[in-house]
């Protein structure tokens, strides 16, 4: 495991952590039972097969 050689200042630590951002998931349109819905791409197949309930929003 990497160990820092010197202590990092508070300002440098916070500016480094500020770069860590969560990204919004890209939504893709899918038609299920005649209704157009937007789901994340990784759930597209499950939504088409009816494995997830899209009405619980």
UniProtKB/Swiss-Prot annotation:
InterPro entries to which the protein is assigned, alphabetical: Ribosomal_bL32, Ribosomal_zn-bd
What Gene Ontology terms for biological process does this UniProt record contain?
A: translation
Record's GO cellular component, any one? large ribosomal subunit
Key words of the record: Ribonucleoprotein, Ribosomal protein
What is the top-level taxon of the source organism?
A: Bacteria
Q: Which GO MF term does the entry hold, naming one?
A: structural constituent of ribosome
Q: Which family does it belong to?
A: Belongs to the bacterial ribosomal protein bL32 family.
Protein name listed in UniProt: Large ribosomal subunit protein bL32
Which species does this protein come from?
A: Mycolicibacterium vanbaalenii (strain DSM 7251 / JCM 13017 / BCRC 16820 / KCTC 9966 / NRRL B-24157 / PYR-1) (Mycobacterium vanbaalenii)
Gene name of the encoded protein: rpmF
């Amino acid at each position: 495991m990497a160990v820092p050689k010197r202590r990092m200042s508070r300002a440098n630590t916070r500016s480094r952590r500020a770069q860590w951002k969560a990204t919004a998931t890209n939504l893709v349109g899918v038609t299920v039972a005649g209704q157009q819905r937007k789901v994340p791409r990784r759930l597209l197949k499950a939504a088409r097969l009816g494995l997830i309930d899209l009405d619980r929003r």
